[in-house]
C-alpha cells in the first residue's frame, strides 16, 4: 500500500509538471497585435500597391475618431448606454481592433486610436510579420495570417462588423464596398 502510494504520488507530480509546462507554452505562444505602424513599414511602396496609403485614405482609419463626435455620443445615449461612445465597449468592438484583448497581447506600437487597422482583417501579426514568413503564404497562414482564399471568405470577414448590430447599418453591398478599400498588389 505504501509503495503504491509512492508511485501514484510520483505520477501526480509528473503529470502536474507536464501539464503546467504546456499551459505556460500555450499562453506565451499567442500572437500579439503589432499595429499599423509596423505593417506600414513594409507596405508603403507605390509599385506594390501602397496598402498603407490606401488604408489611410479609407474610413477604417477614422473609425475611432468617429466615436469621438457628438453624433456618436447621441447614438450611444439613444441606445441606452451611460458612457461616451468612445468609452463604450460595444462601439469599440467594431470601430477598433483588439479593444477587449489583454494588454499583454498588444505591442508597443499598437494604438487603439488607429481604428479598424490592418490586423482587424489580417489577424494579429507578431508571428507572421517577418519578411521570410510573409513571402510564403502557407507559412504566414500557419503563423496567424487570415487566409482569404475566396470572395465568400472575405465577405464573411466584412460582415463581422458590417451587420445589423451597427446602429447606422446600411445594406452591405460587398462588390461596391470592396472596390472602395481594395489594396491589391498590382499584377505584373
Ligand atoms: C518586414 C517587412 C514586412 C512587415 C513588417 C509586414 N509585411 Fe506583409 N508582406 C511583406 C512582403 C515582402 C510580402 C510579400 C509580397 C510583397 O512582396 O509585397 C508581404 C505580403 C503580405 C500579404 C499577402 C500575403 C499572402 O500570402 O496573401 C499580406 C496580407 C500582408 N503582407 C499583410 C501584412 C500585415 C497585416 C502586416 C502587419 C501585421 C504586415 N504584412 C507586415 C513584408 C512585410
Ligand atoms: C472590425 C470591424 C470592421 C471590419 C472587419 C470591416 N469593416 Fe468596413 N467599416 C467599419 C467601420 C466601423 C466603418 C465606419 C467608419 C467610420 O465611418 O468612421 C466602416 C466603413 C467602411 C466603408 C466606408 C463606408 C461609408 O459609408 O463610406 C467601406 C467601403 C468599408 N467599411 C468596407 C469594408 C469591407 C469591404 C470589409 C471587408 C473586406 C470591411 N469593411 C470590414 C468596420 C469594419
Ligand atoms: C457591429 C459593428 C458595429 C457596432 C457594434 C457599432 N458600429 Fe458604428 N459603424 C459600424 C459600421 C460598419 C459603420 C459604417 C456604416 C454602416 O453601418 O454601414 C459604422 C458607422 C458609424 C458612424 C458613422 C455614421 C454613418 O452614417 O456612417 C457612427 C457615428 C457610429 N458608427 C457610431 C457608433 C456608436 C456610437 C456605436 C455604439 C453605440 C457603434 N457605432 C457601434 C459598425 C459598428
Ligand atoms: C477591412 C479589412 C482589411 C483591412 C483593414 C486591411 N486589409 Fe489588406 N486585405 C484585405 C483582404 C480581404 C485582402 C484579400 C484581397 C484578395 O484576395 O483579393 C487583403 C489583401 C492584402 C494584401 C495582399 C494583396 C495582394 O494582391 O496579394 C496586402 C499586402 C495587404 N492586404 C496589406 C494590408 C495592410 C498593410 C493593411 C493596413 C495598412 C491592410 N491590408 C488593411 C482586407 C483588409
Model region roles, listed by residue range:
Residues 120, 165-166:
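Functional cores that coordinate and move charged inorganic groups
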Residues 22-113, 119, 125-152, 172-188:
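Sequence context of c-type cytochrome heme-c attachment sites
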Residues 8-21:
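Bacterial N-terminal signal peptides
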Residues 154, 158-161:
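Alpha-helical multi-pass transmembrane bundles of energy-transducing inner-membrane proteins
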Residues 1-7:
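Positively charged n-region of N-terminal signal peptides that target proteins for export
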